[in-house]
C-alpha cells in the first residue's frame, strides 16, 4: 500500500558533488519519514537505483562507488542500496502502471533519464521486454558531446543521431517484438511524459491517467524549439477551482525545476521519433 507520495527529484546521473549530495540528502529525508512518521522497520525498506542510472554508472565501473557515496550516515547499516535491470524494471512498470483488465492486451513504455524500457505479455502470458539504452538525460549528453552550437545546431544534431543510428536500432527491436506496434493501447510513463502532460494538459495534474495523442507529442516538440515561452506558461484561467489551479501551477513549476530546455528537447525528440516509429502500423493507437 502506498502510504504517501514524497518524491524528491535529484539529478543523480549528473555525477557531480552537488548531485551526489542532493541524492544522499533525499535518501536521508525519506528514510527519516519512513522511520519516524510511519514506523516502518529496516527489514521492509528497499533502496533501489533505476536501471538507467545503473547502466550509465556501469559504463565507468562506478555502481559500487555511487551506492556508497549517496549512502547517508543515518541510514541503518542493514539496509542495502541495490539496483534493478532494465528487464526487471520494465516488467514491474507494466505491472504497476497498466490496469489489470488490460495487462495482457496493452503495451507499456517508460522513458527514463538514462534508458527507455517497456514491453508486453505475449499470448502465453510471458513478458517480452523492450529496452533501449537511451533516455532523456543520456540522449542530452550524447547530443552535447557532438555539438557546442546554439539551439538550432542542438536540434539538427539530435535529428542526425536519430536518422543515422537510433532509428535502425528501434526498427530492429520492433521487427522482433511486433506487438509493440500492433496493439491498440500503449501506456506511457517517465519524466518526459510527465512534462508533456503537465504543459499540454495542465488540468490533468491530479489525474492518475491522461490520454495524449501523437500529435500533442509532436506539437510539444515543436513548441520547445519555436515557442518556448508560451509552452512553459500555459493558460490556467479555465480551471475554475482555485485549489486545483494552484496545484497545477505547482506541478508545472516542478517540471521546469527538474528539466531545462535542452533536457526537454532531448526527451521530446527521442520520444516523438519513437512514438512515430511505433505508430507506423497502428496510427490510431491510444496513448
Feature-to-residue mapping (PLM):
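Short glycine/serine/threonine-rich phosphate/pyrophosphate-binding segments
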Residues: 1, 91-94, 113-117, 271
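A short acidic Gly-Thr/Ser loop motif
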Residues: 1, 108-116, 123, 189-192
Amino acid at each position: 500500500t502506498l502510504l504517501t507520495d514524497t518524491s524528491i527529484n535529484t539529478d543523480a546521473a549528473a555525477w557531480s558533488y552537488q548531485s551526489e549530495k542532493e541524492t544522499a540528502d533525499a535518501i536521508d529525508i525519506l528514510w527519516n519519514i519512513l522511520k519516524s512518521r510511519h514506523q516502518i522497520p529496516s527489514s521492509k525498506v528497499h533502496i533501489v537505483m533505476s536501471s538507467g542510472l545503473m547502466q550509465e554508472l556501469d559504463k565507468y565501473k562506478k555502481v559500487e562507488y555511487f551506492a556508497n557515496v549517496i549512502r547517508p550516515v543515518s541510514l541503518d547499516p542493514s539496509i542495502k542500496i541495490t539496483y534493478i535491470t532494465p528487464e526487471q524494471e520494465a516488467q514491474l512498470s507494466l505491472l504497476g502502471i497498466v490496469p489489470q483488465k488490460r495487462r495482457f492486451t496493452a503495451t507499456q513504455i517508460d522513458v527514463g533519464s538514462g534508458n527507455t524500457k517497456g514491453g508486453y505479455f505475449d499470448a502465453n502470458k510471458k513478458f517480452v521486454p523492450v529496452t533501449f539504452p537511451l533516455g532523456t538525460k543520456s540522449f542530452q549528453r550524447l547530443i552535447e558531446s557532438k555539438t557546442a552550437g546554439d539551439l538550432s545546431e542542438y536540434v539538427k544534431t539530435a535529428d542526425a543521431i536519430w536518422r543515422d543510428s537510433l532509428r535502425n536500432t528501434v526498427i530492429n527491436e520492433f521487427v522482433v517484438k511486433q506487438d509493440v506496434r500492433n496493439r491498440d493501447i500503449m501506456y506511457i510513463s517517465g519524466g518526459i511524459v510527465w512534462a508533456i502532460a503537465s504543459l499540454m494538459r495542465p488540468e490533468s495534474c491530479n489525474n492518475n491517467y491522461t490520454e495524449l495523442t501523437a500529435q500533442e507529442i509532436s506539437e510539444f516538440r515543436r513548441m520547445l524549439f519555436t515557442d518556448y515561452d508560451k509552452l512553459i506558461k500555459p493558460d490556467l484561467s479555465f480551471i475554475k477551482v482555485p485549489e486545483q489551479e494552484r496545484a497545477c501551477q505547482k506541478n508545472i513549476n516542478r517540471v521546469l525545476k527538474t528539466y531545462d530546455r535542452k533536457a526537454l528537447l532531448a526527451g521530446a525528440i527521442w520520444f516523438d521519433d519513437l512514438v512515430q516509429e511505433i505508430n507506423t502500423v497502428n496510427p490510431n493507437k491510444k496513448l
